[in-house]
A protein has these predicted regions:
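Short helix-adjacent coil turns
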Residues: 16, 39, 43-50, 65, ...
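Amphipathic, coiled-coil-like alpha-helical segments
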Residues: 2-5, 21-30, 61-76, 83-116
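Short acidic alpha-helix initiation/capping motifs at coil-to-helix transition points
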Residues: 1-2, 31, 50-53
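Generic hydrophobic alpha-helical segments
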Residues: 10, 38-39, 77
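An anion-binding catalytic pocket shared by soluble metabolic enzymes
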Residues: 58
Length: 116
């Protein structure tokens, strides 16, 4: 079940500055739109090291949102080699991460509109 984003970390980083929070949301929106297709492409090319590296990078920005389920998917992709996950399992994680990204992207778009 998807829970609403927790922007408290964004406000902490921005020291309450609404304009800065909006900039952080715009960066998050960009990542949510760009990284999932890149992850799918890397998976399709069987570039597993690059996929794990991108999952790590993506996880770093998602960690500040309180999206724990999504963050866990990214951690699972990142650690897929250590955990000996099969290609099928990794593909499922990539698909689920993409679905989560779509949900979050809609929520972020609404938050950006509210701050306009």
């Amino acid at each position: 079940m998807h829970k609403p984003l927790d922007l408290s970390h964004f406000y902490d980083i921005a020291e309450g500055n609404e304009d800065f929070v909006k900039k952080l949301l715009l960066i998050l929106q960009k990542n949510l739109n760009e990284y999932p297709p890149q992850m799918q492409s890397l998976f399709d090319k069987k570039s597993m090291l690059a996929l794990r590296e991108l999952a790590h990078k993506f996880k770093s920005c998602i960690a500040y949102t309180g999206a724990d389920e999504f963050n866990k998917l990214l951690v699972d992709i990142e650690t897929s080699e250590v955990d000996n996950l099969s290609e099928v399992q990794i593909g499922l994680l990539v698909r689920k991460a993409s679905e989560q990204a779509q949900l979050l992207a809609k929520e972020v778009a609404n938050l950006i509109k509210e701050k306009a």
